[in-house]
């Protein structure tokens, strides 16, 4: 017999609204990822209701798609919890920038902001970064919206414009970010980013360069693969050189000397040229960050028309999983002392390798259903699985897709892997959760079960 509490949670609490009349499915670049997310969708909120987040109220509308599961993570701020592995990575990066880059007064060049609240406006998250109104990254299926005007930030880049407008020329931003995504050991709806920005005046950039006084930052030219239309080639190449030098020093500090690095050209809406850095770690090339020369239009709009700059962004979980051999992103949210005590280090730069907790067995259950006639999107299903199954769910794989030759209806079959990080799950316990997932999918997504 299915657990009634789970069914109730699935039906009443998957979306913050108590009553959901139907699924409003829309179709789907994320900051510092050059790979666009899959096209996905969201479910309507209840107009007239209000969300309370971090002491502020936000009216809901047809764009509201927050889940209780995600809302419970707001304010946890793992990157600020002392001795948490994400805190260790943040502190190592901060220490490196503080020690390596100083002004004449011997104070740090870069200021650090790691307590900025995650609720931002859609203008901050998209428009300030020159992301077009019709860009797929704005879709409800990829983001968590409080309403049409507010959302949980999808990247720390959402704070770039405000900090530049405040007159800052060099800063790091660290924070939790939120995205609707697939379910596996490397993806979670909440993760943590570190953003870096540096602006240069003409004097700062060309200081020490032969005949630097005759060089200019800007020109009226044309855009090419190597530069923006407003930048001189000399300025761009110096900014690019500084950016790559700064980031190579950073990853060498984190991973050790002798690290092999390569740069891959890519695209971001707010930088050009843009690059991804890959490192050769244990014989495998790993993407660790995205970066580029900031779009001058963004810099100008923030009031720094006489400067040129670079920006980069990296994921803390990505680095921590590699540096500390942490195999599953869910572990970062664990409160198990066996996990946390492994990172109680006297020196933040001390090498540590995560010792796995006992590997409890996985339980596999499949779920098959016919899709509704139109507008089915996978991220709605993933949100249901995450909310009902919570961190019992290790991953979800689409293992079969079938189109009926006569009716042309499409069927999906997903394999859900259940595994608790701290104990063995019983078949009965998993069965209850799985049935609740099935019922919620039927009620909220309009699918027809093949259970």
Curated annotation (Swiss-Prot):
MF terms in GO: ATP binding; phenylalanine-tRNA ligase activity; tRNA binding
Reaction catalysis annotation: tRNA(Phe) + L-phenylalanine + ATP = L-phenylalanyl-tRNA(Phe) + AMP + diphosphate + H(+)
Keywords: Acetylation, Aminoacyl-tRNA synthetase, ATP-binding, Ligase, Mitochondrion, Nucleotide-binding, Protein biosynthesis, Transit peptide
A Pfam entry, by short name: FDX-ACB
Ranges for domain FDX-ACB: 358-450
GO biological process, one term: tRNA processing
InterPro entries noted in UniProt: aa-tRNA-synth_II, aa-tRNA-synth_II/BPL/LPL, Fdx_antiC-bd, Fdx_antiC-bd_sf, Phe-tRNA-synth_IIc_mito, Phenylalanyl-tRNA_Synthase
GO terms for cellular component: mitochondrial matrix; mitochondrion
Claim: ATP-binding is one of the keywords in the record: yes
Enzyme Commission number, as recorded: 6.1.1.20
EC top class, as a word: ligase
Modified residues (N6-acetyllysine): 202
Keyword presence, Transferase: no
SMART domains: FDX-ACB
Residue sites binding substrate per the record: 157-160, 179, 186-188, 193-195, 287, 312
Disulfide bond annotation, renumbered to this chain: none
Compartments (UniProt record): Mitochondrion matrix; Mitochondrion
Assembly mode: Monomer.
PANTHER family, sorted: PHENYLALANINE--TRNA LIGASE, MITOCHONDRIAL, PHENYLALANYL-TRNA SYNTHETASE
Family membership noted in the UniProt record: Belongs to the class-II aminoacyl-tRNA synthetase family.
Function, as annotated: Is responsible for the charging of tRNA(Phe) with phenylalanine in mitochondrial translation. To a lesser extent, also catalyzes direct attachment of m-Tyr (an oxidized version of Phe) to tRNA(Phe), thereby opening the way for delivery of the misacylated tRNA to the ribosome and incorporation of ROS-damaged amino acid into proteins.
Protein known as: Phenylalanine--tRNA ligase, mitochondrial
